[in-house]
Amino acid sequence: CTVFDDGAHKPKYTGASMNECKVHMGHINLAVRFKIWLDDEPFANGIEILFVVFIVSTPFGSTAYFNQITRGVFYTGLGVAFKNTTELTSHVIVPESVVVRAQITRGPAVLAYDNTEKYLDLRQGDRLELRKSEIPATVLTWSRLSNPANGF
């Protein structure tokens, strides 16, 4: 996940996640508004979406928070889900080559990702780019990981 200030070309933050990146409302009493693009195509006809949580998940992470929101898992691509949105939008699974872009149109918000205590405060105008990492992850286990699609 890469975060840019409004209008900036140089990122103010870059982070990596194995499971998911999520944007959550920054204040308990204020939902967040944003616009989203899948590559350069506006999502949901470019409407401004009001939400409590917006998540982009990997297949590995789809069994966790993504599943809690959507009641589904996936084995390839990236999953985009919304929790407590006022819009009639569906969760979507996109090819792993797609870049998910979002811009906060009303904040504040918080960016968090799995297994870390760190988070990043976001404000109105901040832009996010979420994509599959070019660096593969190494998972150490006692036994082999598998799934029905052998995607892990």
In which residue ranges do the predicted regions lie?
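Catalytic phosphate-donor-binding core of small-molecule kinases
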Residues: 1-54, 60-152
